[in-house]
Amino acid sequence: MTDSQTLLADYVNHGSESAFREVVVRHLDLVYSVSVRLVGGDTHLAEDVAQTVFMDLARMAKSLSREVRVGGWLHRHTCFVAAKTMRGERRRQNREGQEDLE
């Protein structure tokens, strides 16, 4: 079985969609479960977070260090994206609450 770093390198070097798909399959449960926990159980927001995380991985894969542990990077990036998403949600809810008062 090939490790995630090798699969990601195959995606970067050869554009292998199947390699990237395998990385997603291997780590989707981790990313989604962390997302659900951090967005307070909102499964729709968690799906948005997970999608953003994997899109970011695809976009940033070339710039990631060869020594980076994909699972660790995904966990940390999921925490970052979930926090950013929740800040945006709070701002949106505050705006909507203020509009209701007017």
Predicted regions and their residues:
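Hydrophobic side chains within well-formed alpha-helices
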Residues: 7, 19-20, 49, 70, ...
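N-terminal module of bacterial RNA polymerase sigma factors
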Residues: 1-30, 97-101
